[in-house]
Amino acid sequence: PRCGWNLEGERDSVVLICSNCETAWEALEGKFNRVRVSKVSGTGGSTVYLPFWKISASGKGLPLHSFADFIRLTNQPRVVRREMENQEMRFWVPAFKIRPKVFLNLSRQFTVSQHNFHPEEMIPKKNLYPVTLPQSEAVQSLKMILAGATLNKKDVLPHLPNVSFDIMDSTLVYLPFTDTGHEMIQQQMRTSINKNSLEFGRRL
């Protein structure tokens, strides 16, 4: 859309890449919208980059305006540091379809432990897993992710019907995984995803 070069992606991709001007585009309502993209650098020749939506959001109906609010609200066993009070609340959501249980587990783990990731604004040159979950569907999952991350369910579940989110920003972030043949292992977190689950997700 910007430079006239062909966009690249697989048949089920909802975000297409222009390798010429290093931009990414999501097709919405018959037109292409630019997507901000970052990556966390990986190491090793067997690195595959899996996409995640990093969504900055503020909650209504519950006190959820910063990462510190999230840690308190979900009762995480972490010390709330002063800098967390000024840190935007960012949900990390798989940008690929996968079984609901795995989807929620990945969202919970990566949202809680997002301090492990230090993205830089660039698109990986190769080994990109396709984006098969649109940003709009990732936004729709935020309530479920909040509920899934909450350790003391009775603190949050009764309020969920009245919860909504203001979306401030979103970025597509490619995280590095090591392909072991049977699993994909996230290089910073050591979280593993069974490759059969990824294959199944391509058929959802």
List the predicted regions and their residue ranges.
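Long C-terminal interaction/binding lobes of large macromolecular proteins
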Residues: 1-2, 6-204
